[in-house]
Amino acid sequence: MILVKDAIINGKKQDLLVEGNIIKKIGNISISEVSKDETEIIDGKNCVLIPGLVNTHTHVPMSLFRGVADDIPLMEWLSGHIWPMESKLNEKIVYAGTLLGTVEMIKSGTTAFNDMYFFLDSIIKAVDETGIRSTIAYGMIDLFDEEKREKELKTARKSLETIKNLNNSRITGALGPHAPYTCSKELLESTNTLAREYNVPIHIHMNETLDEINQVVEKTGMRPFEYLNSFGFFNDVNTICAHCVHLSDSEIQIMKEKNIFAAHNPVSNLKLASGVSPVLKLLENNVPVTLGTDGCGSNNNMNLFEEIKAAALIHKGVNLNPVAVTAKEAFEFATLNGAKALNINSGEIKEGKLADFVIINMKKPYLTPKENIESHLVYSFNGVVDTVVIDGKIVLNDGKMVTIDEEKVYELAEEAYLELTK
């Protein structure tokens, strides 16, 4: 068990008891109510306890791509830099990159993430060791080639079976067709079939740039969401669509009707000059918005607090509206909405919820005065957290990783980077 004493929880000073992996009780809890020998007691004085953040779109192993190709347009960035480097990937490199990325996320308050990438056995191994929660998809790209398509679908099915057989509630599977402009109709149709067979979500890039939208329109005569909807891609599945930058009104209606989650990646979209997602229109149409960092190659970090701040600021600026995307809304994008998108029983601090939470020491200049903590967490916090609990286990204590040797992670990452760039 874990007992957190005297922390600010849901706006007031109280205690929190974890039993197993569940928040058992919130309120005034005496130490005499628990067994001292079986309970880890955390002093929450001068601290705020918040839900763990949920990163709904990323490519975690790309933590090794940090800073390698800055200030370049998306298509040139992909074809001239990222894809050539990815051709050198192997299990060892992906393992090292995933370790580095998960440590970065945990140390900045993220307790769960939604990933699409390659070498999934290496990702699973790193996730298992660090203790983070994850939904993992193999990134499928067939480039309209039948032989490649069959290979990609076979790999995706094998990955789902591997994750299913883990019997690890922290690690779940998803299907990750890259995007409509890189995947054939046949692959996309098979994706929906597999998602329903395995009861897993679909994670896909949608409408990130004008160029890719034009490619789909030229090929099909329809915009991407219209095209996918025409053959039932969104039917009877939970779909998380990353980016959603350039959307028509009809596409937003499809998102609303099909209960699609938008994974908003404001920093990545700004860095690659892709544009700004019409989040206000999405909210007006009751389309749920979540937050993602994207990969470090286009961000260049995995600090979701930066995405929260960016989401709260950019829509005020582009809409000339100071109340567009409030601090509360932006925070919920990264907590409650993200948890709903990944079907995780978390995202808020309530009895009966999973014990995925973060403790932050408020004795910091940027978190003072403490009376305005909700504002501070969105507009002034730098993301450096003190304690992280995931699935009822302490994985970060006093800013230090508990589950793995952090120095070894940095050593492996440097070695992997040298191999990747030689």
Curated annotation (Swiss-Prot):
Highest taxon of the lineage: Archaea
Binding locations of substrate: E86, H178, E208, D294
Keyword terms of this UniProt record: Hydrolase, Metal-binding, Zinc
Record-linked CDD domains: ATZ_TRZ_like
Enzyme class: hydrolase
Binding annotation for Zn(2+): H57, H59, H205, D294
InterPro entries given in the database record: Amidohydro-rel, Deaminase_MtaD/DadD, Metal-dep_hydrolase_composite, Metal_Hydrolase, MTA/SAH_deaminase
Gene Ontology molecular function: 5'-deoxyadenosine deaminase activity; 5'-methylthioadenosine deaminase activity; adenosine deaminase activity; metal ion binding; S-adenosylhomocysteine deaminase activity
Cofactor note: Binds 1 zinc ion per subunit.
Misc. comment: SAH is a product of SAM methyltransferases and is known to be a feedback inhibitor of these enzymes. As a result of this inhibition, organisms have evolved efficient enzymes to metabolize SAH via different pathways. The pathway found in methanogens differs from the canonical pathway, it uses the deamination of S-adenosyl-L-homocysteine to form S-inosyl-L-homocysteine for the regeneration of SAM from S-adenosyl-L-homocysteine. 5'-deoxyadenosine is a radical SAM enzyme reaction product which strongly inhibits radical SAM enzymes.
Protein task: Catalyzes the deamination of three SAM-derived enzymatic products, namely 5'-deoxyadenosine, S-adenosyl-L-homocysteine, and 5'-methylthioadenosine, to produce the inosine analogs. Can also deaminate adenosine. The preferred substrate for this enzyme is 5'-deoxyadenosine, but all these substrates are efficiently deaminated. Likely functions in a S-adenosyl-L-methionine (SAM) recycling pathway from S-adenosyl-L-homocysteine (SAH) produced from SAM-dependent methylation reactions.
HAMAP family, sorted: MTA_SAH_deamin
Name by which UniProt lists this protein: 5'-deoxyadenosine deaminase
Provenance organism: Methanococcus maripaludis (strain C7 / ATCC BAA-1331)
